[in-house]
């Protein structure tokens, strides 16, 4: 599946809370403060809403606000304000807290996946080869140096050698899985699976967290509809 999880996710575009990034930087992750990553957020997006110095306008990824303005939403906003929850017109802007309309990676009715935004425009380049129906099994090492990768293509195992670098972008699940299968990770985990240890790195495969997403259901005599024809 080209585009990875961006081709199957819920299409909601959320940068994350500024405090989280700043906390990472305070913990020693230099270069991960919100001010550090903001230029990259701006560079990647083409925001179709109100302009702001915090939003990008010329990036490859189209970001839109849901166009549906059901009357029910006005009641939700009013209820939130009565509970002292502020209405936030852009939760990817100055403040991240509050209630507001969802921003999505949808443009003119089409999902704006990483494949649509980044890969499709350049797939005709002569120095780019896209191999589908393939699964990376593990990285190949000569001592501590990564020299290639083992790939399963349909029913064949193929070894690819590299002369420069490998960028591992398998996502929150597959990236640590590939590292562990390659011998990089917690010693006890690898020994349990009889995987030779290349590099002990205790953080690999640990501390995965997902966001909280409470669901609510309401009943009304009003006609409800939803459209994503942005």
Residue ranges and their predicted role:
Residues 2-110, 185, 189-203:
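Rossmann-like flavin
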Residues 169-174:
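Glycine-/small-residue-rich beta->alpha transition segments that form the dinucleotide
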Residues 216-219:
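Short, compositionally biased segments
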Residues 221-224, 228-230:
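Single conserved hydrophobic/aromatic residue that forms the stacking wall/gate
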Residues 132-145:
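A conserved short coil-to-beta-strand element within the FAD-binding core of flavoproteins
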Residues 128-129:
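Short, conserved active-site loop motifs that form the nucleotide-linked donor/cofactor pocket
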Residues 156-165:
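Core beta-strand elements of the Rossmann-like FAD/NAD(P) dinucleotide-binding domain
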């Amino acid at each position: 599946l080209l585009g990875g999880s961006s081709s199957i996710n819920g299409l909601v575009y959320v940068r994350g809370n500024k405090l989280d990034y700043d906390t990472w930087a305070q913990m020693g992750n230099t270069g991960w403060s919100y001010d550090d990553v903001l230029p990259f957020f701006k560079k990647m997006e083409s925001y179709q809403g109100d302009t702001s110095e915090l939003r990008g306008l010329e990036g490859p990824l189209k970001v839109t606000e849901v166009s549906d303005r059901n009357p029910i939403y006005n009641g939700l906003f009013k209820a939130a304000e009565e509970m002292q929850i502020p209405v936030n017109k852009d939760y990817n802007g100055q403040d991240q807290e509050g209630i507001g309309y969802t921003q999505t990676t949808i443009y003119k009715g089409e999902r704006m996946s990483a494949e649509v935004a980044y890969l499709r425009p350049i797939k005709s380049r002569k120095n780019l080869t896209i191999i589908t129906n393939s699964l990376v099994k593990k990285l190949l090492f000569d001592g501590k140096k990564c020299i290639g990768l083992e790939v399963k293509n349909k029913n064949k195992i193929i070894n690819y050698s590299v002369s420069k670098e490998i960028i591992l972008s398998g996502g929150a699940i597959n990236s640590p899985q590939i590292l562990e299968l390659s011998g990089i990770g917690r010693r006890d985990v690898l020994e349990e699976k009889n995987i030779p240890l290349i590099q002990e790195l205790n953080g690999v495969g640990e501390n995965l967290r997902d966001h909280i997403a409470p669901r609510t259901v309401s009943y009304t005599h009003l006609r409800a509809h939803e459209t994503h024809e942005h």
